[in-house]
Amino acid sequence: MSKRTFQPNNRRRAKKHGFRLRMRTRAGRAILAARRGKGRVELSA
């Protein structure tokens, strides 16, 4: 029997998909800009 693949961890979630990580790269900033343009309430994890 295999275990469930999603093991929630807030720290890992923020490190991999967080706002500061998005701001770090040009591509990440583009993601945030796209989400702002779309009117997302939450921009990142």
From Swiss-Prot:
Query: Which Pfam family would be a valid example here?
Result: Ribosomal_L34
Cite the entry's keywords alphabetically.
Ribonucleoprotein, Ribosomal protein
UniProt-recorded name of the protein: Large ribosomal subunit protein bL34
Q: Which domain of life is it from?
A: Bacteria
UniProt-listed InterPro entries: Ribosomal_bL34, Ribosomal_bL34_CS
Q: Which GO terms describe its cellular component?
A: ribonucleoprotein complex; ribosome
Example of a GO MF term: structural constituent of ribosome
Q: Hey, which family's this protein in?
A: Belongs to the bacterial ribosomal protein bL34 family.
Gene Ontology annotations of biological process type: translation
Under the heading NCBIfam families, the entry gives:
rpmH_bact
* Species for this entry: Paenarthrobacter aurescens (strain TC1)
Tell me yes or no: is Transcription among this UniProt entry's keywords: no
Q: What gene does the UniProt entry assign to this protein?
A: rpmH
